[in-house]
Amino acid sequence: MYRAVTRGIEVSVEPFYLEDQSEPEENRYVWGYRITIANNSTETVQLRSRYWQITDANGYVEEVRGPGVVGEQPTLEPGDSFQYSSGCPLTTTSGVMVGRYQMQGNGGSLFEVDIPAFSLDIPEQRRTLN
């Protein structure tokens, strides 16, 4: 499990390899990841957008931006949490993802919340990022 905390917003990530969706002979490797966003702050926040930087084992970098997550822009009261799952295909056996969410606070102010860097590795090549 990977964790980062920004302004009382904790983001936890649990990546997992999806062997049944991967096709190594076609250089297609697929991972899922489960993210929990916990609002440990004293203000209500809304997740407005996401940004991902995905780097494969060859150093190829892809950037992904978009509104919300999995079609939602959840609002989190203090003490609330939101969990979702998504996935990422690569053409290499490993990679790294890192990113950030743009959140909106009570007064309309926007701020960024870090998504911790996490490694995508097939089980035979497991590594750990701290």
From Swiss-Prot:
Domain of life: Bacteria
GO-annotated biological processes: error-free translesion synthesis
PROSITE patterns recorded: APAG
Span of domain ApaG: 3-127
NCBIfam families: PRK05461.1
HAMAP family registered for this protein in UniProt: ApaG
Protein known as: Protein ApaG
Source organism (scientific name): Brucella anthropi (strain ATCC 49188 / DSM 6882 / CCUG 24695 / JCM 21032 / LMG 3331 / NBRC 15819 / NCTC 12168 / Alc 37)
